[in-house]
């Protein structure tokens, strides 16, 4: 299971989403590759934070 854990750096905070705005949509860059994806993050987050992603293939849908 440890091989699936990936670290990613928050590059840009895109905006708030969710029914009450409790989720933040962010663009992250993986530390071990040059790949960028969008993720939804619950809780406080800002640019430069390092996230530990247990599942790295799932990408969030864009905000409307």
Swiss-Prot record:
Manganese found in the keyword field: no
Annotated Gene Ontology cellular component terms: cytosol; cytosolic ribosome; cytosolic small ribosomal subunit; plant-type cell wall; plasma membrane
InterPro entries attached to this UniProt entry: NA-bd_OB-fold, Ribosomal_eS28, Ribosomal_eS28_CS
Family matches, as Pfam families: Ribosomal_S28e (PF01200)
GO terms (BP aspect): translation
GO molecular function: mRNA binding; structural constituent of ribosome
Endpoints of the signal sequence: none
Keywords in alphabetical order: Ribonucleoprotein, Ribosomal protein
Record bears the keyword Ubl conjugation: no
Similarity comment: Belongs to the eukaryotic ribosomal protein eS28 family.
Protein name per the record: Small ribosomal subunit protein eS28z/eS28y
Organism: Arabidopsis thaliana
Gene (UniProt): RPS28A
């Amino acid at each position: 299971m440890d091989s699936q854990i990936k670290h990613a750096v928050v590059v840009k905070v895109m905006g708030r989403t969710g029914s009450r705005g409790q989720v933040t949509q962010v663009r992250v860059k993986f530390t071990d590759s040059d790949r960028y994806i969008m993720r939804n993050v619950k809780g406080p987050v800002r640019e430069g934070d390092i996230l530990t992603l247990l599942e790295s293939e799932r990408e969030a849908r864009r905000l409307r």
